[in-house]
Amino acid sequence: MEIYYHGTSKKFPAFDMAHALEGDGKIKMGAGFYLTTGYKRAAHYSCKSPGSTDFYVYTVEIPDLTPENHIEFKEPVNPIIIRHAEEKLGEPIPLEETTDGKFFRKYIAMKLAGKTGNKKLTPEDEMAAADFLISIGVIYNKVPFIWTKPVVHYDVIVMKPDVMRILKIEQVELAPPRKNAKPELVEGSQREIPLDSLK
């Protein structure tokens, strides 16, 4: 099992895909819940929802990432995943679309939506792609955010929320951002929210 953090302005007892777009509504790296290895990064994410005044960081446990259950930004897609996707689509996937997890995800989304060229994907298209990937055993999308080798700091987009277990919820305070900067966690402001109070 692996431990990550999730920032949000909402309190809830379990993750539900119906609420996956309640942050800023953007899907930059695919549909799902965005977890991160960095606590401070999660705290920053907690203020993404417009008009939010309360901020929370969730400590979350998920099953280990394996070569067969995740795709990764700027990394080739595992051959087993490619084979399962081709079997389900009923046709081969162009080699260039398998050289990067991002290309692969977008190709699947475009194919399912019947779109070509530079047509923009909708949140619904991305959700359909997530459902497709889940059906072939892919439940994570890994995206590094600090590129120093070896890469140890990254975000994980979880497409299948029922694998996520909330271990702890903490309400946090954020300092007003300096000019051209992001809001920052106020160290020591964390206040744990009892999980049984949300049931």
Regions found by a protein language model. Give the residues of each.
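Active-site and NAD+-binding cores of ADP-ribose-processing enzymes
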Residues: M1-M29, S46-K199
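Glycine-rich phosphate-binding loop of ATP-grasp-fold ATP-dependent ligases
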Residues: A31-F33
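Extracellular glycan-interaction surfaces
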Residues: T36-H44
